[in-house]
């Protein structure tokens, strides 16, 4: 259970966009109590995580804009919604 479980609950990568691609990386470490979110390698969120669940709203893209919602819950996989539809991790 060790590494596989830890990776599933603390790190996730998603690719969004049809013509304008973006990669969203989420690192939510419940033991060190921080959340870091990067878009295309640039850190956009770096906050302490002191509660069991958090939601972050972002707008991503230039020509192709997307409303992104990131849901982080303790001991659960990270969920990402883009324009109301769930995105699968890469």
Feature annotation, model-predicted:
Residues 1-90:
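Cysteine-centric segments in proteins
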């Amino acid at each position: 259970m060790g590494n596989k479980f830890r990776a599933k609950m603390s790190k996730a990568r998603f690719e969004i966009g049809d013509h304008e691609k973006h990669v969203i990386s989420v690192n939510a470490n419940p033991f060190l109590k921080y959340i870091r979110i990067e878009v295309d390698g640039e850190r956009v969120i770096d906050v302490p995580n002191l509660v069991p669940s958090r939601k972050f709203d972002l707008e991503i893209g230039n020509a192709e804009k997307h409303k992104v919602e990131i849901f982080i819950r303790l001991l659960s996989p990270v969920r990402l919604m883009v324009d109301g539809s769930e995105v699968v991790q890469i």
